[in-house]
Regions:
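Aromatic-lined carbohydrate-binding/catalytic grooves of carbohydrate-active enzymes
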Residues: 60-88, 107-110
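Catalytic domains of carbohydrate-active enzymes, especially glycoside hydrolases
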Residues: 49-70, 282-287
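Short, flexible active-site loop motifs that bind/organize anionic cofactors or intermediates
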Residues: 40, 47, 78-81, 329
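Aromatic- and Gly/Pro-rich amphipathic surface segment
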Residues: 26-55
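Active-site region of glycoside hydrolase catalytic domains
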Residues: 1-34, 77-79, 88-446
């Protein structure tokens, strides 16, 4: 690994902070997401424990830490002209403390935290006005962090915009619109949003590095039948490659435009939007992704119409099992080889530095005798770190860094505390917040 390799961890602040409506923060789409009756307004109280949590990161030898600036803490409604200074001050102090501890901040600019007002009054990124609200939000952050933050990620797991639309893109299916139309329009709009963010970052702080990010899980064909191979190829293109193809080549890929054409869907892109995507592709510094698992997929033998088959594959919810890999209790396949495969695949396709900005395993853990025994997670990390070492040293992949998910416990994207990822155990359960005391796990010593 390079001397400047960015070892560390990553966290979604909206899932950890709490500080529900403190210091001018507004409601966001994660706050209002109703999945479980679990109390989420405190989360794991990172808002009041952030120094303690960063101290643990320093003890573990972190060289980098990725966090997200909660949009609704900076622009409570999302459409304000001026940012909330108390919100900016909170993250500014965090950046300064990280630098004091020798930890490089990596900042995500939207991560499940769009102001709820933009969902309910604009339908999020389905509305092009929201792209400009987002660009204003990005400018507020970069102006404040200029000269201190070197690395930005424009949009967390942008390829999931349609599949977790309320949470990832603040959007719901409009009345009278098909989900295929929403798939096309929303994917185009978030690509424009990413490109606008790149433009703002490079204009405000030309020395900063900016990357685009996907939530990656490679799709393997279930069998060696040609139909299954074609199904996996199509799924990978639309789920994994579309984003990077657009970001790196500066235009929508032919297969995406053909998908729209086959369904008589107008792309509705202005020349200005095409230009900003093209310009951003020339300025993008690296490609980031999360990796937890691989998937398998098969064709649908009973569907003969090609359009229907493609739509079934895009919105497939079958969760087919791979017989060659174990899974955690949520059914996520543990496949370290898939991480090496992904690194080699992306690097040979795009020839840009890569950055693993999330990798970890969710486990239902409890304390025993005041300790958390974490052999299962340690084994997971050992396998995945070995895989990335092979990708770098043997396959020649240019890898910037590896950020584990995650330094501390937090609520999952579905607001569960039971699904834990943290290097540091936070003592609370489903109903009882207890004292939110921190306990370092064995895994903090990996």
């Amino acid at each position: 690994m390079k001397k400047e390799f960015l070892w560390g961890g990553a966290l979604s602040n909206v899932q950890a902070e709490g500080g529900y409506l403190e210091d001018g923060k507004g409601l966001n789409v994660y706050d209002t997401l109703v999945v479980t009756p679990e109390p989420t307004d405190v989360a794991t109280d990172h808002y009041h424990h952030w120094k303690e949590d960063i101290d643990y990161m320093a003890e573990m030898g972190f060289k980098a830490y990725r966090f997200s600036v909660v949009w609704s803490r900076i622009h409570p409604l999302g459409n304000e002209e001026k940012p909330n200074e108390k919100g900016l001050d909170f993250y500014d102090k965090m950046v300064d403390y990280l630098l004091e501890k020798g930890i490089e901040p990596v900042v995500s600019l939207v991560h499940f935290d769009m102001p709820d007002y933009l969902l309910n009054h604009y339908n999020g990124f389905m509305n092009k006005e929201v792209i400009e609200f987002y660009a204003r939000h990005v400018e507020s952050i970069v102006e404040r962090f200029k000269g201190k933050v070197k690395y930005y990620i424009t949009y967390n797991e942008i390829n999931l915009a349609i599949h977790m639309s309320d949470l990832v893109s603040g959007a719901r299916l409009p009345e009278g619109m098909t989900k295929q139309e929403m798939f096309v329009h929303l994917n185009v709009n978030v690509q424009v949003a990413h490109a606008r963010a790149v433009e703002v970052i490079k204009r405000v702080d030309p020395q900063a590095q900016v990357g685009g990010m996907i939530g990656h899980a490679p799709f393997y064909p279930l069998t060696c039948k040609a139909d299954d191979i074609l199904a996996a190829d199509f799924k990978n293109k639309m789920h994994n490659y579309f984003v990077y193809d657009t970001m790196c080549n500066g235009e929508l890929p032919q297969y995406f435009m053909q998908y729209a054409k086959n369904r008589n869907i107008e792309l509705n892109m202005s020349q200005e939007e095409k230009d900003v995507i093209k310009d951003a592709s020339k300025k993008l510094d690296y490609l980031a992704f999360s990796y937890y698992r691989s998937n398998v997929i098969s064709s649908f033998e009973d569907i003969k119409d090609q359009n229907e088959l493609e739509d079934a594959l895009i919105f497939d919810q079958r969760s087919l099992k791979n017989p060659y890999y174990d899974a955690n209790e949520w059914g996520w396949q543990i496949d370290a080889d898939g991480l090496r495969y992904s690194l080699v695949d992306f690097y040979h396709r795009y020839h840009k530095p890569l950055f693993i900005v999330e990798n970890g395993i969710g486990i239902d853990e409890t304390m025993k005798d005041g300790k958390v025994y974490d052999d299962e997670r340690i084994a997971y990390y050992q396998k995945h770190i070995k895989a990335i070492n092979t990708a770098v040293e043997h396959d020649g992949v240019d890898l910037m860094g590896y950020l584990a998910w995650s330094p501390i416990d937090f609520l999952s994207s579905h607001k569960e505390i039971r699904k834990r990822y943290g290097f540091v155990y936070v003592d609370r359960d489903f109903e009882d917040l207890k004292e939110l005391k921190r306990y370092p796990n064995h895994k903090g010593k990996i």
